Design a protein with these regions (language model features):
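Positively charged, low-complexity intrinsically disordered leader regions
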Residues: 3-134
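Claisen-condensing/thiolase-fold acyl-transfer catalytic domains that form or cleave C-C bonds
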Residues: 269-277, 369-435
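Alpha-helix C-terminal capping segments
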Residues: 124-134, 148-160, 181-182, 279-289, ...
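Active-site nucleophile and cofactor-binding loops and adjacent substrate-binding regions
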Residues: 108-119, 137-146, 237-240, 266-271, ...
Length: 458
């Protein structure tokens, strides 16, 4: 097996080559993402209105569409060096197994205890909370990677951490729950009886397996009902995509180091944190006309926000207590089926990603979970990494694109984000291996109630 042009299996940046600034793609966007709206006044949210919910510096980052780069504080840079720079891996073995002329690379973000990219933003948000003198933070988590990452970050800065975990994942992934507790976090299955909004959701949807929207509502209520606490979010918000830009910046630097030009960039899409972070420098070049890339967002067919959602203002949470965001959404009342990609079970999408999609700078596809797990197992057997179900959505489409190259003979360069590992997802792998996994694709009538509940905004 040759490594033409002496491209190694793993491309690592040196520590002194790591980015020292986050890139704010909003500053380069011709059409800025629509502002968050106050659900009461329907006017853009102000700094003062967001202050009770988020840390002050994070509010500033959230509202800033113009600053191109933000300096990464030295303390955060030092923490990053525990697990960054992360490798850009040439998937030589996958290429050989597929018999494709395509060149496949993946950015591996699973080389830390959280098992995912989520630590990139968790440590930033915990840093700003500590700097503000807060007691602790609250949050939601789907599959548990974000909750794990935040518990690690809070432990590092000696902050209290309260996590509301989507009930289906709380039950399916007890080991990830215990990792959070090991780092000092308290973990509550959502929806729960511990909050007013949780009790209301349980009354309206008895036996529900929960959703990220439900967990967000509970975490926000828990933060705003006690002093010294703020809410932090693992995805969706512009501030999170800002912190996650380190993924794309490192990826671009690693490619440039070997004069590699990507043709296709692929990321899984739930709320948009990994996707937005990975694609940011690539889409920035595309906006400025400096390069052209096919950028593909991959979402589950059971929760198809981009491919079947509506571009409208909607609540970010099921309890309708958060600001309104303009995004591709299935409606805040939409509760997805209990699929095995808990991190992608969100009714909406980042406003930044939504605007990029609406402007046709990126495209989107949805895939069924049985096909996703087929790709996951194929990848695991040849590349030696057990991928998370979320990441495996990107693997599925990367394989599909590589097989298209096999048909056409094109030597395209495909880059995808391997967001994390699947070692705590063995219930899902077991269902697949036993032939018990099923696909659920909502019908139009299934989606209609969510759309009917969208806020009426002139």
């Amino acid at each position: 097996m040759s490594t033409e042009k002496k491209i190694p299996y793993k491309i690592y940046l040196e520590e002194n080559e790591m980015p020292t600034q986050w890139y704010n793609v909003r500053a380069d966007m011709k059409n800025k993402p629509a502002p968050l709206l106050n659900p009461g006044t329907l006017k853009p949210m102000t700094f003062e209105e967001l202050q009770p919910v988020f840390c002050d510096e994070l509010v500033r980052q959230e509202l800033d569409n113009d600053t191109l780069y933000f300096d990464i504080p030295q303390e955060i840079q030092d923490f990053y060096k525990m697990y960054r720079p992360s490798p850009l891996v040439r998937a030589y073995f996958l290429e050989k197994a597929l018999g494709t002329p395509a060149k496949i690379y993946y950015k591996f973000e699973g080389n830390n205890t959280s098992g995912s990219h989520k630590l990139n933003s968790a440590i930033a948000q915990a840093y700003y909370a500590k700097k503000q003198g807060l007691t602790g933070v609250t949050t939601e988590t789907g599959a548990g990677q974000w909750g794990t990452a935040l518990s690690m970050a809070c432990s590092y800065f000696d902050l209290d951490c309260k996590v509301y975990m989507v009930k289906v994942s709380y039950e399916q992934k007890p080991f990830r729950r215990e990792v959070m507790r090991t780092y000092g976090a308290s973990v509550t299955p959502s929806p729960s009886e511990t909050t007013e909004v949780g009790r209301r959701i349980l009354a309206e949807h008895p036996g529900t397996s929960g959703s990220l929207g439900c967990a967000i509502s509970e975490a926000v209520e828990a933060a705003t009902s006690r002093s010294g606490y703020r809410y932090v979010l693992g995805s969706v918000l512009s501030q999170v995509l800002l912190h996650q830009s380190i993924i794309g910046l490192e990826t671009k630097a690693a490619l440039d180091k070997y004069d590699i030009k990507a043709d296709i960039v692929i990321g899984c899409a739930g709320g948009g944190s990994n996707l937005g972070g990975l694609i940011s420098p690539f889409v920035g070049e595309k906006i400025k006309g400096e390069a052209d890339y096919r950028i593909i967002a991959v979402e589950p067919a059971s929760c198809p926000s981009l491919t079947r959602g509506r571009y409208a203002y909607d609540f970010c949470d099921t309890g309708m207590i958060c600001p309104l965001a303009k995004m591709y959404t299935l409606g805040s009342g939409f509760i997805p089926s209990a699929n095995h990609a808990g991190g992608l079970r969100y009714h909406g999408m980042s406003s930044v990603v939504s605007q990029l999609y609406d402007d046709k700078l990126i495209e989107a596809v949805s895939v069924e979970q049985t096909e996703v797990f087929a790709a996951a197992e194929q990848f695991a057997r040849v590349e030696g990494i057990l991928p998370a179900p979320e990441s495996s959505h990107a693997i599925r489409v990367a394989i599909d694109e590589a097989l298209k190259c096999k048909e056409t003979g094109e030597e395209k360069t495909i880059v995808f984000g391997l967001t994390g590992t699947g070692y705590f997802d063995m219930v899902a792998y077991g269902k697949y291996n036993d032939g018990e996994m099923t696909d659920y694709i909502p019908t139009d009538s299934d989606l209609e109630p969510g759309f009917a509940g969208l806020p009426k905004i002139d």
